[in-house]
């Protein structure tokens, strides 16, 4: 038996030398010697016929051979796998001197950029940012704002009604009147950005959904000069410090007096063009009363900005639909950092 074990040891190492460069052959060798019906298994079965004294010696030699085969095969497999990996890495070697690939960096949507610009301005002036429901009751969307049932001004804001008492808000003024009630007659300075909805036919300049940002100030001794200065700050922030504005009378049921604000554009021939950008006015006394303010003690002003209109004028865009088509060719023009976007 000892001679047989010695011969098997020689046989294993001879086969190993022939097949150690092939992983599949090593697996076959493993199965041949260590498998369930392999050479060592059959050798172990032969122990049963040996005398007790020889059985112990032969069993020990078989275990030594088994451990030698296991460790040797494991070592050769690791060497072979490591060599294969190194060869693969050499084939896929990276040249660190090559220039890196440029990739597109995301940026805020142009409408959000304008909202953030306005928000930063008003936060620096001590205003708070308030947001609210896009589905609103008729009471807060119209009645609290001096537009009772049947008021003709409701026709100015064709609405999407969900049921007789609920609709998609037509402005963010619903946020303002709720905040006024929450303050219980105290002063406030807020802006309220968000999406609003009106039953308009979609075309180059109209959309049934658009972005709006409204502002509201309530305090003692507020007058029209405060409103005018605020409007100048807005236009200078958005269009430059030299930008002129033109104020003209208008009508809104929730402000009195009410005005429209136009940008004054001087053409090359010296003539002037007026582009409407927002509406504003002093808060109507009835709106103050509705929110439990005493109009004899408190006054206020409000303004509403259509974000898409500002963006279209600022960036000379001729179709509002561009903001909502998600065309990366359009949007990347407004990326704040275009360093890595040149070849996208």
From Swiss-Prot:
Its main location: cytoplasm. PROSITE patterns: AA_TRNA_LIGASE_II. It comes from Onion yellows phytoplasma (strain OY-M). Its cofactor is Mg(2+). It catalyses: tRNA(Phe) + L-phenylalanine + ATP = L-phenylalanyl-tRNA(Phe) + AMP + diphosphate + H(+). Binds 2 magnesium ions per tetramer. Its EC number is 6.1.1.20. One of its GO terms (molecular function) is magnesium ion binding. Mg(2+) binds at residue 256. This is Phenylalanine--tRNA ligase alpha subunit. The keyword Methyltransferase does not apply. NCBIfam families: pheS.
